[in-house]
Structures are given as structure tokens and as C-alpha cells.
């Protein structure tokens, strides 16, 4: 888990060799390797491998995000149903009040959460505590799949804040824009 020494460099590689450490230790399959490349402070390339699932997600400049070579896209705007789900942190029951009409799931890997939102399986995800190495690759993949990232408070989110502080300064929601707007009304920080 690290970034290059100079966060102001034109190119910065960001590596998390084991995202989802607790899942890995528990013998659960939801963990992965995450590699991102920032170009002038913006995610330009991302690769997330979920080895036990046989899934490799990636994004490169000017191309759609892919899962094992097949293009992926976030869930389209629509009405929510009871089987729809969002990803949440494992400690959400202590930190948030969530009034979501579908299901909530904790995957145990922030990288996997970005991937499931990017491929349209999850409507969105709430991410409350993360370092740059947890999100750099996922941001590139999510954005290439048509997704967005916004602060839970509604303030504009900028990855440069995470680069400077090495961690999120407030929770974020990821997904398609209309889903994020609805989720923000249904998730309250305690």
C-alpha cells in the first residue's frame, strides 16, 4: 500500500497489493490487487484483479471500462426495486442511518465495491474511510464506466484532497449521477 514519493509528479503510480485484507484473512473471496495511475493528479488508468473470482477490471484513457475484456457501464437511471443493492462499509450500523428500499451489502473490499458499481450490479456504494491506494484504480474504472463520485454532504469531491491528505476527508457516494442524488437523501451520518 503506497504511492510514489512525489505526489506532485506528472505520473504517480498507486498500488494496493491486497485490498480487502480482513476478507483475505477470513478466507472470503472478496479481495484483490489494485493498481492505479494518476496523470497530473487525475486517475488515467486503473486495474483491479479479484483473483478468486477470476475477474480483471481495467480502464485506460479514452476507452470504456472493461471486465475480462467486455465493456461495462454503471446502472442506468431507473426506479429502484427490492432486489437492488448498495455497498456499504462494515461499520455503517454505527456511523450512518440508511433508509434504502433495497438491500445493503458489505463486500469487505473498497476496490470490489468500485468494480460492482462500475459494472452496474450495485446501484452505488458509500465509502467512508479510505486511503488513496484504496480508490485510485477504482476511480479510473468507475469514471470510464460512466460513474461519478460525490461527497455525502453534497460538497464537490476532488481526488486531489485525497492525494494531499492520503485519505478521504469525508464520506463519498459512487454511482450513476441520479442514483447518487437519491442515495444522498437516504444516508445520514450520525
Residue ranges, per PLM feature:
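Residue-level signal for inorganic ion chemistry
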Residues: 21, 50, 59, 117, ...
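Short strand-turn-strand beta-turns centered on an Asx-Gly dipeptide
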Residues: 40, 68-69
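Short beta-strand scaffold segments in enzyme catalytic cores
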Residues: 33-37, 46-48, 56-57
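Oxyanion/phosphate-interacting regions
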Residues: 115-190
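Flexible, acidic active-site loops/lids enriched in D/E/S/T/G that coordinate Mg2+ and/or position polar
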Residues: 1-39
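Hydrophobic "anchor" residues
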Residues: 22-24, 43, 56, 65
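Short polybasic amphipathic segments
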Residues: 35, 63-67
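Phosphate/pyrophosphate- and phosphate-bearing ligand-binding catalytic cores of soluble enzymes
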Residues: 73-144
Amino acid at each position: 500500500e503506497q504511492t510514489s514519493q512525489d505526489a506532485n509528479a506528472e505520473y504517480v503510480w498507486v498500488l494496493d497489493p491486497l485490498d480487502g485484507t480482513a476478507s483475505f484473512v477470513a478466507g472470503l473471496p472478496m479481495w484483490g490487487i489494485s493498481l492505479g495511475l494518476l496523470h497530473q493528479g487525475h486517475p488515467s488508468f486503473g486495474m483491479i484483479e479479484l483473483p478468486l473470482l477470476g475477474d480483471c477490471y481495467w480502464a485506460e484513457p479514452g476507452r470504456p471500462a472493461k471486465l475480462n475484456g467486455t465493456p461495462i457501464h454503471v446502472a442506468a437511471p431507473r426506479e429502484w426495486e427490492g432486489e437492488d443493492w448498495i455497498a456499504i462499509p462494515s461499520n455503517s450500523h454505527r456511523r450512518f442511518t440508511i433508509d434504502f428500499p433495497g438491500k445493503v451489502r458489505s463486500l469487505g473490499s473498497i476496490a470490489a465495491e468500485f468494480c460492482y458499481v462500475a459494472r452496474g450490479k450495485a446501484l452505488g456504494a458509500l465509502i467512508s474511510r479510505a486511503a488513496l491506494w484504496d480508490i485510485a484504480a477504482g476511480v479510473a474504472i468507475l469514471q470510464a464506466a460512466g460513474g461519478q463520485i460525490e461527497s455525502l454532504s453534497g460538497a464537490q469531491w476532488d481526488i486531489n484532497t485525497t492525494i494531499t491528505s492520503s485519505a478521504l476527508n469525508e464520506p463519498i457516494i459512487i454511482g450513476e449521477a441520479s442514483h447518487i442524488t437519491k442515495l444522498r437523501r437516504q444516508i445520514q451520518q450520525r
